[in-house]
Swiss-Prot record:
InterPro entries found in the cross-reference section: AB_hydrolase_fold (IPR029058), UPF0227 (IPR022987), UPF0227/Esterase_YqiA (IPR008886)
Protein name, UniProt field: UPF0227 protein Shewmr4_1727
Highest taxon above the source species: Bacteria
Protein family: Belongs to the UPF0227 family.
Taxonomic lineage: Bacteria, Pseudomonadati, Pseudomonadota, Gammaproteobacteria, Alteromonadales
Pfam families registered for this protein in UniProt: UPF0227
NCBIfam families the UniProt entry points to: PRK04940.1
Organism: Shewanella sp. (strain MR-4)
């Protein structure tokens, strides 16, 4: 089972396409949707929704996959549920990058302060990160520097921030899920 978390653009047709591509790894791909506008509510909703879906899961190794803002949540929700995560162009600092896009981006900083201290250290090797060298939204070099002490970093030379084509990375994602 794969839980897919969309980015800030929840209605993008690319979400359906990415879910279809992920079905080459596991036919059971589930969209876990969230508002993107209310961080504290989103966190509660995502925790509850993943817990509910896990009740009906017979997969010994379910996987969280998120893109952009969805990768921010995949890392945290995956950690809190003991799941591996694939972070695609993760938005590591939405309290900064979401300024002017949502009402209270400072809620992300509050969430970070309330999270388990040094959660990445405790989550080492339980996530892999796929970064685009041509991400037009986020600084992928800074993201790599922040995450490389904890997670494997895979680079893509052609995809943009929304990462429409996962095909080149599906074998690595599958190996990570099963490994």
């Amino acid at each position: 089972m794969i839980f897919y978390l969309h980015g800030f653009d929840a209605t993008s047709p690319g979400n359906h396409e990415k879910m279809r591509q992920l079905q080459f790894i596991d036919p059971d791909v589930r969209l876990i949707s969230y508002s993107t506008l209310h961080p504290k509510h989103d966190m509660q909703h995502l925790l509850k929704e993943v817990a509910k879906q896990m009740q009906y899961c017979d997969d010994p190794a379910p996987l969280m996959v998120g893109v952009g803002l969805g990768a921010y949540w995949a890392e945290r929700i995956g950690f809190l549920n003991g799941l591996k995560s694939v972070l695609i162009n993760p938005n590591l600092h939405p309290e900064e990058t979401m300024q002017g896009k949502i009402d209270r981006p400072e809620e992300y900083a509050d969430i970070a302060n309330k999270c388990v201290s040094e959660f990445r250290l405790k989550n080492t090797h339980k996530a892999m990160c796929i970064l685009s060298r041509v991400d037009e939204v986020l600084d992928s070099e800074a993201t790599a520097e922040a995450l490389k002490p904890y997670y494997t970093i895979e680079w893509d030379e052609t995809q943009t921030h929304k990462f429409p084509q996962l095909a080149a990375h599906l074998p690595k994602i599958k190996a990570f899920k099963l490994g």
